[in-house]
Amino acid sequence: MPLLFVLLSYLLGTFPSAYLAGYLSTDRDIRLMGDHNMGAQNAYRCLGRGWGLAVFVFDLAKGSLAITLALAAGLSPGWVMFCGLAAVLGHNWPVWLGFRGGRGEATAIGVMLLIATQPMLIMGGLGLLVLLFTSSVIAASAVMFGLLWLAVILYGLPGGVVAYSIGLPVVVGLTHFIRSRKNRL
């Protein structure tokens, strides 16, 4: 039963919100526009503020929905976190689009909002401040995810959640690094 929810979470993650936004707004594949990334930041740059925000909300919701379904099914905390990872992996490597997806930032935020709500809200607020002052999504994400583990510890959450608050952002960061290198080559 838990593996079924992991698979469902992966499939939720594969919902291609940026891809659909690209076709709905310009009749073009977003992976052929801007930085070729299928995520909210590229949608914002190439399609405009409204489309970028819509993609961000949908991508965040994919992560939150995966966790909500796993919790509703009564899965153990380990399986719930695995479902969150599966949603991020689905976003990053969707089977329907040749495994060419986004970087997973918004989906990971959606996951962490339900795994560690208060720490994620605080770090999300801090990330938003960094974004407002620097206009850099990379800097905002680095601060938000880079300090999330510390906020999780300060809130006294279990060690598994601390490890997850480090591991999930590592997946996002590595995906960003790999995709950025490919775009430079």
Swiss-Prot record:
GO terms for molecular function: acyl-phosphate glycerol-3-phosphate acyltransferase activity. Keywords: Cell membrane, Lipid biosynthesis, Lipid metabolism, Membrane, Phospholipid biosynthesis, Phospholipid metabolism, Transferase, Transmembrane, Transmembrane helix. It comes from Dehalococcoides mccartyi (strain ATCC BAA-2266 / KCTC 15142 / 195) (Dehalococcoides ethenogenes (strain 195)). Pathway: Lipid metabolism; phospholipid metabolism. Its main location: membrane. It catalyses: an acyl phosphate + sn-glycerol 3-phosphate = a 1-acyl-sn-glycero-3-phosphate + phosphate. The chain crosses the membrane at residues 1-21, 47-67, 69-89, 113-133, 137-157, 158-178. This is Glycerol-3-phosphate acyltransferase 4. It is a multi-pass membrane protein.
